[in-house]
Amino acid sequence: MLMEDGGLDTTSEEYRKLSKAERRKRRRATPKYRNLHATRERIRVESFNMAFSQLRALLPTLPVEKKLSKIEILRFSIAYISFLDNLLQ
């Protein structure tokens, strides 16, 4: 039985009677679902990258223009937080 979004109702009796290969074939996402998922993923990645940019802007590194990888940003952040913590103690 098809659902409103064009996908197959996996709880239906019709679906359970299909072989494993047929079920796998029918479970493929519809183009509409794939587009929605791609859009959500793109927004998630943009948000993630924006957070890294904001974190990068707070790090005192020289030169400021130097491009850092995400792992470098995280490692420098850890080191900087440790440094600031030591200053307070």
UniProtKB/Swiss-Prot annotation:
Q: According to the UniProt record, where is the region Basic motif? A: 32-45
Q: What Gene Ontology terms describe what this protein does at the molecular function level?
A: DNA-binding transcription factor activity, RNA polymerase II-specific; protein dimerization activity; RNA polymerase II cis-regulatory region sequence-specific DNA binding; RNA polymerase II-specific DNA-binding transcription factor binding
User: Which effects follow disruption of this gene?
Assistant: RNAi-mediated knockdown extends mean lifespan and reduces expression of bcat-1 by >50%.
**Annotated stretches, region: Disordered:** 1-32
Q: Which UniProt keywords apply?
A: DNA-binding, Nucleus, Transcription, Transcription regulation
Query: Which PANTHER family does the record match to this protein?
Result: HELIX-LOOP-HELIX PROTEIN 2, T-CELL ACUTE LYMPHOCYTIC LEUKEMIA/STEM CELL LEUKEMIA-RELATED
What exactly does this protein do? Transcription factor which binds the E box motif 5'-CA[TC][AG]TG-3'. Involved in modulating physiological aging, probably by regulating expression of branched-chain amino acid transferase-1, bcat-1.
Residue ranges, annotated region (Helix-loop-helix motif): 46-84
Q: Give start and end of each bHLH domain.
A: 32-84
Question: Superkingdom, according to UniProt?
Answer: Eukaryota
Q: Where does this protein reside within or beyond the cell? A: Nucleus
Tissues in which the UniProt entry reports expression? Expressed in sensory head neurons of the lateral ganglion.
Q: Write down any Gene Ontology CC term.
A: nucleus
The protein here is known as: Helix-loop-helix protein 15
One GO-annotated biological process of the protein: positive regulation of DNA-templated transcription
Bias-annotated ranges (Basic residues): 22-32
Q: Which organism is it from?
A: Caenorhabditis elegans
